[in-house]
Each structure stands twice: as structure tokens, then as C-alpha cells.
Amino acid sequence: YGRTARLERDTRLAVLPIGYGDGFPRGLSNRAQVELAGVRCPIVGRVCMDMCMVDVTDLPGVRPGDVATVYGPGLTEQDARLQDTIVYELLCALSPRVPRIYLEQGRPIS
């Protein structure tokens, strides 16, 4: 959308099902990263209404259905800095479409 990214090499992109319709800010377009298989992967192009794309060129083992961490340790703080805001504002903006998994002592409780 809008041709906001210019790729300098052959690139493999993954499409993530989260976008500004879910409360993931458009201001993170071409700026933020997500985590896949323990590796930070840059967002490429604009965050769309229901999706965003990330560069997984250097992760040949990534497959459809793999888990991507959008907000997590280090990532949420980084995104807040990029948006000139606080972590709580980002988390409060997430829509009900985004499932919540609550942890107690590192284990999911709901």
C-alpha cells in the first residue's frame, strides 16, 4: 500500500494477521520489528487495516502458522518509543479482536 518500502534484495515476506483495525498503530509502518523464531524481523511497508508484512528472508525455516510476537519483552517498549508514547497506551488500544492470554507464574490461565 502506497509503495512506502523499497526492497534492495530478493525478499521473502510473511503476512501477519494484525493491523490498525486491531489497534496496531500505522505509525509503526517501516519502523518496528516483530519476533519470529527468536529473531527480530522488520515490518515492511505500511501497517494495513487487517495485516502487516515482515521480512523473513533470513529465516528460511519460518512456515505458515508459526507464532509471531508483536508485543512482548523489549518489543512493546521499542514500539512505545517509536510512537512517542507509553506501553500502556499501546496495550489499551488493542481491540477485542486480539485474543488475550493471561499468565500466572509463566503459565497461561485464560
Q: PLM features: what roles do these ranges have?
A:
Residues 1-110:
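Active-site anion/phosphate-binding pocket segments in diverse small-molecule metabolic enzymes
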